[in-house]
Amino acid sequence: MKRVLMLSTVASLQDQFNMANIRMLRNLHCDVHVACNFVQGNNTSPQRIAVFQNELAALGVTCHQIDFARSPFHLLQNHRAYQQLKAVLRADAFDCIDCHTPVGGIYGRQAAAAFQIPVIYTAHGFHFFQGAPLWNWLLFYPVEKYYARKTDVLITINSEDYDRAVRKMHAQQTRSARSRHPY
């Protein structure tokens, strides 16, 4: 049975965008784990997060609390989260890590490289785009370009991101969200 870790900074992202993927993986008899911050930074209520955790449990999905901060500038908190993530990876042999969100994606790809686990990163819209503030380009573009080289499959949501990723990012594979999911 394939074991897949679905990783994001916060639980609300998994709830709002990944439940169909989680169900699909379970239907394919994958052992699915979700790792994210169930406590802080979510854009849904604590009650909704509790319901979401119950839904995951009913599907047989294992949950891991990772204390990520949404901001990349909370370095100590995110360093602790990275240590927690590495502990999860040490405890279970994962066949794939599916990363979402900029912070979760960076730490997930770093950990995947350290543990030699194939990694998928879905960019739900790069923070650098035509018309974005210069600050976004200076901060996010070089980081995403660097970590794309540690990415087996980079999935983009919109055509601008896809075109830029193909031309500049150099992931092993780049796909549009409109293509079939790579599981």
Task: Name these PLM-found stretches.
Residues R3, D95-C96:
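Structural motif
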Residues R3-L5, A112-F129, E144, I155, ...:
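Active-site proximal beta-strand in glycosyltransferases
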Residues M6-Q77, D161-R164, R175-S176:
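N-terminal strand-loop element at the rim of the active site
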Residues A20, V51, R80-A87, Y107, ...:
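Alpha-helical elements of Rossmann-like donor-binding domains used by nucleotide-donor carbohydrate transfer enzymes
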Residues L76-Q83, P118-I120, F128-Y146, K150, ...:
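Nucleotide-sugar donor phosphate/pyrophosphate-binding loop at the beta->alpha transition
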Residues V88-D95:
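Glycine-rich phosphate-binding loop signature in dinucleotide/nucleotide-binding domains
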Residues C99-G104:
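Short His-centered aromatic/hydrophobic patch
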Residues K150-S176, Y183:
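A short, active-site helix/loop in glycosyltransferases that binds the activated sugar's phosphate group
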